Regions:
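Acetyl-CoA-dependent GNAT
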Residues: 3-80, 85, 98-99, 104, ...
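Short coil/turn segments at alpha/beta junctions that flank glycine-rich nucleotide-binding fingerprints
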Residues: 75, 91, 107-111
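Active-site acidic-Proline motif in GNAT/NAT acetyltransferases
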Residues: 85-87, 91, 119
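Residues forming the Rossmann-fold NAD(P)(H) cofactor-binding site
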Residues: 91, 95, 99
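Conserved active-site alpha-helix within GNAT-family acetyltransferase domains
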Residues: 95, 120-138, 142-146
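Conserved GNAT acetyl-CoA-binding A-motif
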Residues: 98, 105-117
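Terminal substrate-recognition subdomain of acyl/acetyltransferases
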Residues: 147-159
Length: 159
């Protein structure tokens, strides 16, 4: 089983396919549906270095996951668009995406990583809690978010 995590251009066709699949899954899963125009922005341009990063995951040569980082001011970063294809879940890809993104974030000067998530994304919430994220008060007005988390990245070793 070969899993490769690498930086990608968020404007690439593979990145667009991953993000579209993520949006479609949210549309089908969330009680209120999902319209990306109504959520907190994470446009591809915001996920380009030096103020962002976009990672994709490949399993056996197929692009099966992604996540983005928005570098904000004062050492804050926000994890965005974390998604793994249903066909590749259970292989540890989300964990690898998260850990790899945290390592890149440290190199980019991020000291605290924040994220929000929906109550329907139970596995994601458990992933974040297992990896040291703690519940915080809402830091944005995302209408689809029910939980907000953060993790101090200071002290994480760079790769």
């Amino acid at each position: 089983m070969t899993i490769i995590i690498q930086a990608a251009d968020p404007f690439s066709e593979e990145a667009k396919r991953c993000i579209q699949a993520y949006f479609e899954e949210l549309q089908n899963l969330l009680d209120e549906g999902f319209n990306p125009a109504n959520t907190v922005s994470a446009d591809p341009a915001e996920l380009l270095p030096p103020s962002g990063l976009f990672l994709v995951a490949y399993h056996e040569g197929d692009c099966v996951g992604c996540c983005g980082l928005k570098v904000k001011s004062d050492g804050l970063g926000e994890l965005k668009r974390m998604w793994v294809s249903p066909s590749a879940r259970g292989l540890g890809i989300a964990r690898q995406l998260l850990e790899t993104m945290e390592q890149h974030a440290v190199k980019m000067g991020v000291e605290v990583m924040q994220l929000d998530t929906n109550r329907k994304l139970v596995a994601a919430r458990h992933l974040y809690l297992r990896h040291g994220y703690v519940s915080i008060k809402p830091y944005n007005s995302n209408p689809y978010a029910h939980y907000w988390f953060e993790k101090r990245l200071v002290g994480l070793s760079e790769f």
